[in-house]
Amino acid sequence: MLTQTDNELICRTGPGTPMGEYLRRFWIPALCSDEISEPDSPPVRVKILNEELVAYRDTNGDVGLLDNYCPHRRASLFFGRNEECGLRCVYHGWKFDTKGDCVDMPSEPAESNFKDKVKIKAYPARDWGGYIWAYMGPAEFQPDLPEVGWAMVPDSHRKVSRRLQENNFVQGIEGGIDSSHISFLHFGLPPVLRDDPNYTGRTLTNTDSAPHFLVKNTDYGFVYGANREAENNSYYWRLTPFMLPFFTVIPGGSGDPDQRTYSGHGWVPADDESCWMFTYSWNASRPLNHGEGHDASFLKKEPRTLRAILNKDNDYGIDREVQRTQTFTGIDSISVQDSGIQESMGAICDRTKEHLGTSDSAVIAMRRIYLQACRDLLEGKEPFVPRKGSAYRVRSVADVMDRSVTFEENTKRVAVGVA
């Protein structure tokens, strides 16, 4: 459990909050690149870290991420005209470039220099690995982009998506680093996944529902291991890297680690009661096939809000007969099972009422890292992890191995290039 004070500390992410300032030290995904795929295409609303922004790609292909509200009379720039290397407010014609400079002010006299005195809030934005990334922190601490696996492969080798999840981002992360729940929440598979080679470990996760858990801190966050009993004096190991501030790589697949398809999620706060679940799948050795990738990439979403069609308003499509006869939940899709349960805890979970057990080792480790990071910032200590971009070249592990192979030996296999 957490105290109410600590719970508030890690869950509140607006400007000026300790957690919000910590997250702003990192490059974070704001939207998918294909949402603004063409120069001069329509701008897109973006809400991250409790800030309402608008993203656009200008005539030259450069990306702008601006305050949604024009500094003149606060009209929304979502309705603006994206033309001739700038976003123009349709209320009075003020126009802003990707750096936030006002480059045209047709409502003022031609001889006026007023436009030279007006700027709009603009954040550095980069097109990287299928996402538009934003840096929202102090300029003097801007790091290099993280070398995440899906960004290090050609476009055809990856798939990315995002959708809205209606709970605080911490709940999403806690689900992503909890290996124990797969033996229950995801017990039984929808037919489309029953023969999927990425789920060959399913039998082992179902037959041993109380695995042994270990955590090791790393330069990028930590790696979390769970081993389950397997045949022939072996363990089934699942190792999940947690990359600060909110990324995971899900254990799965089989065969040569360099040939596998990997998937993961990142949970980016929209505000304190909702988050964006970014999903990525990639294969370093070949292009992804049609239909390949995490099931979250294929969920039906409301086109304007990016909210899943199966949501709390329709109880996530739960089918009690399927629950009775086929799956543990009666809810279709692993991703909807996850988001449904995470949203059921409330917008911000009351962690003062929890009772954590040994299976919650990774959750406890993540909270400790967050709390310490917030306290360090309050004391003026800057985080070092954002400057460790090359440390993010990691992947998950899901393999049956001899009992003699230790957790420490297994953690070395998380680094890309180690068999």
Regions inferred by a protein language model and the residue ranges of each:
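Rieske [2Fe-2S] iron-sulfur-binding domain
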Residues: 1, 11, 32-159, 212, ...
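C-terminal catalytic domain of Rieske-type non-heme iron oxygenases
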Residues: 15, 37-38, 62, 139-419
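Alpha-helical interaction segments
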Residues: 16-17, 81, 86, 306
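Short, flexible, glycine/charge-rich loop motifs used to bind or transfer phosphoryl groups or to couple energy/partner
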Residues: 18, 77, 162
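A generic structural signal for short, non-catalytic loop/turn and secondary-structure boundary residues
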Residues: 21-23, 48, 118, 127, ...
